[in-house]
UniProtKB/Swiss-Prot annotation:
SMART domains, alphabetized: RNAse_Pc
Protein name: Seminal ribonuclease
Disulfide bonds: C12-C70, C26-C81, C44-C96, C51-C58
Enzyme class: lyase
Organism, scientific name: Saiga tatarica (Saiga antelope)
Gene name tied to this protein: SRN
């Protein structure tokens, strides 16, 4: 299956473009979670942690999830955004807000 992130080093380049994260500038980092939406939303009721920016509305998943980490390569410049694709199984941290409380 050539479409899975693990076998496709171009995954991030395609997905970042499709999700409009390369319009106007290159978004430097993005993580895609390959889990059911309900499982990602459930993280908002799991372990509360402090966000990187100091906010207190972040939560860490109880279990490892399948993710793809996309990071802009050092040599890429807008409009030719290029990304390194890394697949991993790890606990994710999401910021949550609203009612119902959902990832943002």
């Amino acid at each position: 299956s050539g479409s899975s992130p693990s076998s496709n080093s171009n995954y991030c380049n395609v997905m970042m473009f499709c999700r409009k994260m390369t319009q106007g500038k290159c978004k430097p980092v993005n993580t895609f979670a390959h889990e059911f939406l309900a499982d990602v939303q459930a993280v908002c009721s799991q372990k509360k942690v402090t966000c990187k920016n100091g906010q207190t509305n972040c939560y860490q998943s109880n279990s490892a999830m399948s993710i793809t980490d996309c990071r802009q390569t050092g040599s890429s410049k807008y409009p030719n955004c290029a990304y390194k694709t890394t697949q991993a199984q790890k606990h994710i941290i999401v910021a949550c807000e609203g009612n119902p409380y959902v990832p943002v």
